[in-house]
Amino acid sequence: MANHKSAEKRNRQNQVARLRNKSTRTAMKNSVRKLDEALEAGVEADTAEALRGAISRIAKTASKGVIHKKTASRKISRLTKRVNALVAA
């Protein structure tokens, strides 16, 4: 329980930010999950489209500061590598 007015305000701000970050992170996870499903199906056209969406969502999440820039880069790299392996096979 906050004892100061500024601490109470900070708690309110943190709650709003937490909900905003959670929403952004969930959207990112959903786009990656969609890509995973496309990879399992093995359809190249769907996979390429899902990859574009996932990359966009991951980059947007990083630009908002929800995840670190290098974490986003690593995720994008790994997903792209998986898609390229499917295309090459």
UniProtKB/Swiss-Prot annotation:
GO cellular component: cytosol; small ribosomal subunit
Pfam families with a match to the protein in the record: Ribosomal_S20p
Bias-annotated ranges (Basic and acidic residues): 1-11
UniProt KW Cell division keyword: no
GO molecular function, one term: structural constituent of ribosome
Region spans: Disordered: 1-30
Keyword Ribosomal protein in record: yes
GO terms under biological process: translation
Keywords, in A-Z order: Ribonucleoprotein, Ribosomal protein, RNA-binding, rRNA-binding
InterPro entries xrefs: Ribosomal_bS20, Ribosomal_bS20_sf
NCBIfam families membership: S20
PANTHER family: 30S RIBOSOMAL PROTEIN S20 (PTHR33398), SMALL RIBOSOMAL SUBUNIT PROTEIN BS20C (PTHR33398:SF1)
Family from the record: Belongs to the bacterial ribosomal protein bS20 family.
Role played: Binds directly to 16S ribosomal RNA.
Protein name: Small ribosomal subunit protein bS20
Native organism: Desulfotalea psychrophila (strain LSv54 / DSM 12343)
